[in-house]
């Protein structure tokens, strides 16, 4: 009997142990289960690039978006429209009409202060240059970019022009003054950081001879840019002798310090991995970092007290030539992205949200494209997560079906705070009827969003980013 009781007791203890272990296993979330979108995620749609001419049709489209759970529409507020008449001569009437239409539909409105040119890039269907009077404010050498072959690019003001910050500050101030009355429908504001609204150089521009999957070209060949590079190197090392020691060169004058004279050779001959190459690439990115700090500070100064919402900027998804053995990461570096860790830290320092693109794309890392967009999304997202930088996403090209599933995977895995789809006509026809893609967008993206319980008037976060 004693033996029976002992065995029975041991059996009960074993059973209890198994039950407790099973309970602990069930109660502990797996890595997959713990991955989730952010609590405040919202789904948004990008409006047309060009001006609205048929407001009746546009309002029907907006109503369809609202009825299907879309939170906000994101809009380029073109500098070339609002300040075209002259310096500090603003006309915001078109965008007030636009905001009224959005408000009437019960949607939120996310403006992008678009200080870049529209036209000439993938997906551009309009031609909106920068205000023409800008040319009287400085020299072309100061205000424009110039690439390896001498092509001068005026898609956006060069960050190296001393007047860039002042012009943006005046634009931001006027926007805040004119749209303070619309703050109930503005949950976020985006800043254009450069070409196509992205914080980058205009390295891949078809008019300059670029075509996919070309690496693009460095944009540091104005005298202003060359002198800035020389000054930065002299400041870093303290003297030409110390520069020569670091680089293993025999320069006799600071004027002999130049950006790479042969962009292809810079990679194929290994120059990118030399002390000189690393210094150049680091400086080249630092120009963008400083620019982000300038526009971020101006935006916070003008917007925080008026709107009290998050402000964001954009990094481009330069996903090709990433694993090219002869030119690794050459496309990213021509665009100004050398060290993502350092660049994303600047977003943290400037208190800006980060938007990234190409969430719908899959890797295909073979020649000639060497394209790794999914890997790039993971890299950027992981760094942002580690630094506590809020993430928002967008598609690079028109998408649907499996692309929506890929987007769902990324926004869930990395806790994205929102997603904006390019572009409204992909989801809604001009007569307001849904396209075949709207159901997929609802299933995979809108279904992740949180209901707006503020009657269309509360401030929440949404997102926008421009192509990759």
Swiss-Prot record:
Reactions catalysed: Hydrolysis of (1->4)-alpha-D-glucosidic linkages in polysaccharides so as to remove successive maltose units from the non-reducing ends of the chains
Write the signal peptide boundaries: 1-36
Q: How is the cofactor bound?
A: Binds 1 Ca(2+) ion per subunit.
The entry's active site is: 198 (proton donor), 394 (proton acceptor)
Q: Which PROSITE patterns match?
A: BETA_AMYLASE_1, BETA_AMYLASE_2
Its GO biological process terms?
A: polysaccharide catabolic process
Its top-level enzyme class, in one word, is hydrolase
EC number of this enzyme: 3.2.1.2
The family note in this entry says: Belongs to the glycosyl hydrolase 14 family.
Give the protein's recorded name. Beta-amylase
Q: Which organism is it from?
A: Cytobacillus firmus
């Amino acid at each position: 009997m004693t033996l029976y009781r002992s065995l029975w007791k041991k059996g009960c203890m074993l059973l209890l142990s198994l039950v407790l272990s099973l309970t602990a296993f069930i109660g502990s979330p797996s890595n997959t289960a713990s991955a989730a979108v952010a609590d405040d995620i919202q789904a948004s749609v990008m409006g047309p690039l060009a001006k609205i001419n048929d407001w009746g049709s546009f309002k029907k489209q907006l109503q369809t978006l609202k009825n299907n759970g879309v939170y906000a529409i994101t809009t380029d507020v073109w500098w070339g429209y609002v300040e075209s008449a002259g310096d500090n001569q603003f006309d915001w009437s078109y965008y007030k009409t636009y905001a009224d239409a959005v408000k009437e539909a019960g949607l939120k409105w996310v403006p992008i202060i678009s200080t870049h040119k529209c036209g000439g890039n993938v997906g551009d269907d309009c031609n909106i240059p920068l205000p023409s009077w800008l040319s009287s404010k400085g020299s072309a050498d100061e205000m424009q970019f110039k690439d390896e072959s001498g092509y001068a690019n005026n898609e956006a003001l060069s960050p190296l022009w001393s007047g860039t910050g002042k012009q943006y500050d005046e634009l931001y101030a006027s926007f805040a003054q004119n749209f303070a009355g619309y703050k109930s429908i503005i949950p976020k504001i985006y800043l254009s950081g450069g070409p196509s609204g992205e914080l980058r150089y205009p390295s891949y521009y078809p008019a300059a001879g670029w075509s996919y999957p070309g690496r693009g070209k460095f944009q540091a060949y104005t005298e202003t840019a060359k002198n800035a590079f020389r000054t930065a190197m002299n400041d870093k090392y303290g003297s030409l002798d110390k520069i020569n020691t670091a680089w293993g060169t025999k320069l006799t004058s600071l004027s002999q310090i130049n950006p790479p004279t042969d962009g292809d050779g810079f990679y194929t001959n290994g120059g990118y991995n030399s002390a000189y190459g690393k210094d150049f690439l680091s400086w080249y990115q630092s120009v963008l970092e400083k620019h982000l700090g300038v526009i971020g500070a101006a935006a916070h100064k003008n917007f925080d007290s008026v709107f009290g919402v998050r402000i964001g900027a954009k990094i481009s998804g330069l996903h090709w030539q990433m694993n090219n053995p002869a030119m690794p990461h050459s496309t990213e570096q021509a665009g100004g992205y050398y060290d993502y860790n350092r660049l994303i830290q600047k977003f943290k320092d400037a208190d800006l949200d980060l938007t990234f693109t190409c969430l719908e794309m899959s890797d295909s890392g073979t020649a000639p494209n060497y394209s790794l967009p999914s890997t790039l999304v993971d890299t950027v997202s992981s760094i942002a997560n580690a630094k506590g930088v809020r993430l928002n996403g967008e598609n690079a090209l028109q998408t649907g079906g499996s692309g929506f599933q890929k987007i769902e995977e990324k926004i869930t895995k990395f806790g994205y705070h929102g997603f904006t789809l390019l572009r409204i006509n992909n989801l809604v026809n001009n007569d307001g009827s849904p396209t075949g893609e709207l159901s997929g967008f609802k299933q995979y993206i809108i279904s992740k969003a949180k209901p707006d319980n503020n009657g269309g008037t509360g401030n929440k976060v949404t997102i926008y980013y421009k192509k990759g």
